[in-house]
Design a protein with these regions (language model features):
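Mid-to-C-terminal Rossmann-like scaffold of FAD/NAD(P)H-dependent oxidoreductases
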Residues: 1-2, 8, 276-380, 384
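Glycine-rich Rossmann-fold phosphate-binding loop(s) that bind the pyrophosphate
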Residues: 7-10, 124, 146-150
């Protein structure tokens, strides 16, 4: 059996490696972005001079041949699901028995005037990084539009090269559609501590201005202010990259529609995983879901490999988790922690704004006080420990008594659990020690 994978990001590469572990099937991975798999999360460190591209490749180049995974560096221009083959830009045709689409995502645009000018771009691919390196050389000012995780990474990249940057964020606090107020305030203040970054809250982009040669010369904000710049980073999120299937019978909505086995809807022997996949659940009561996360993409790759090589088993995401970095503040989240709590939820939080540290536990506000989620800033907690507590419905009191077990390095790292226990005793009027 020949398994053909389009896309060599973490989803596609994980699928290929897991299939090889489970079988002797022929595997081909096609990518137009790069010849070899690299760590996308490390692209920013190439720009900042901390790493070379070679250092972002987790595997030596000989690894793929040794493991009988064929790599094709080419662009797919057509898919024929009836005859079960793809066509490459080089003219080559590749037949398949199973096709896995792992085409990732692309930066979102909202139809702004001037969004296609030279010097205006998103940041997702290796080509985006190369373009940013070329277009930010010797510029006087940059503008970032959008306050998500890619936005703050871009701000750190530009800051490392001492490029004055105006950072436009629509919300009243940084990422406050995701972070509760205390976390959002800590991150907002931390961004503002960097002198060359001008953070503008409650501010949106209205228009990008042309210098007359097709390049950007500035932007106009929602308040009518004109800000001169030679580079604009559009970091208002990503969307599934489905261009490759638009002329096929493969169904799409936001992403490529798949069931809980990652099988494309109504298209036999085609699968989609990672950022490009939109899961439709058979029960009909769960909304369709796109999971544009590194951790999810890795899990998708492992799951689809097992479904092809072993018994079909529905994907189970398990307890949600994610991690990020806001300049030098590490962030981890496990379970359910929303910007605004539901009526059945309460929270216990301790924070130190001076040293930029925070611990938050969200729990049910009934008698059980079952723990639902954790947010951690500036402290490292173990994902497996926190997830296990959430999965088995551990109570707030049980978690607090054993909280040190979650600390990533309890022997040498500073301990903050006692502060959260003191907050519990104050709030719940107990004497937990």
């Amino acid at each position: 059996m020949h398994i053909l994978i389009i896309g060599n990001g973490v989803a596609g590469t994980t699928a290929a490696r897991t299939i090889r572990k489970l079988s002797n099937h022929r595997i081909t991975v096609v990518s137009s972005e790069s010849e070899y798999f690299f760590s996308r999360t490390a692209l920013m460190y190439i720009y900042m001079g901390h790493l070379t591209f070679e250092q972002t490749k987790p595997y030596e180049d000989w690894f793929w041949k040794k493991n009988r995974i064929d790599l094709v560096h080419d662009h797919v221009i057509g898919i024929n699901t009836d005859q079960k083959h793809i066509i490459l830009q080089s003219g080559q045709k590749l037949d398949y028995d199973k096709l896995i689409l792992a085409t990732g995502s692309r930066p979102r645009k909202f139809g702004w005037k001037g969004q296609d000018l030279r010097g205006v771009q998103g940041l997702y691919s290796l080509q985006d990084l190369q373009m940013m390196i070329a277009q930010t050389n010797h510029i006087k000012r940059a503008v970032i539009v959008g306050g998500g995780l890619i936005g703050v990474e871009t701000a750190e990249m530009l800051y490392s090269r001492k490029i004055p940057t105006t950072f436009l964020v629509r919300e009243a606090r940084y990422w406050n559609t995701v972070l509760p107020d205390e976390e959002s305030a800590i991150i907002t203040d931390h961004i503002r501590e960097h002198p060359s970054i001008d953070l503008r809250l409650n501010t949106e982009l209205r228009e990008i201005l042309d210098d007359g040669t097709g390049a950007v010369r500035g932007i106009i904000t929602s308040s009518g202010e004109e800000i001169p710049c030679e580079f604009v980073a559009l970091t208002v999120g990503v969307e599934p990259n489905t261009d490759i299937v638009q002329t096929t019978n493969i169904a799409t909505q936001r992403g490529i529609l798949v069931n809980e086995f990652f099988e494309a809807v109504d298209t036999p022997d085609v699968y989609a995983i990672g950022d490009c996949a939109e899961m439709r659940f058979a029960n009909g009561s769960t909304p369709n879901r796109v999971e544009p996360l590194w951790y999810a993409a890795k899990a998708h790759g492992e799951s689809v490999a097992r479904n092809i090589c072993q018994n079909r088993q529905a994907y189970n995401r398990g307890v949600f988790f994610n991690s990020a970095k806001f300049f030098d503040i590490e962030y981890q989240t496990y379970g359910t922690v929303q910007a605004k709590r539901n009526a059945n939820e309460d929270t216990l939080v301790w924070y130190d704004t001076k040293n930029k540290r925070l611990l938050r536990i969200v729990f049910e506000n009934d008698g059980s006080r079952k723990v639902l989620g954790f947010n951690v800033l500036g402290i490292r907690y173990r994902q497996n420990v926190c997830s296990a507590w959430i999965e088995r419905g551990a109570s707030l009191e049980e978690v607090l008594k054993n909280l040190r077990a979650a600390n990533f390095d309890p022997e040498f790292a500073p301990q903050y659990e006692s502060f959260l226990i003191a907050e519990y005793n104050r709030k719940i009027a107990q004497n937990l020690v």
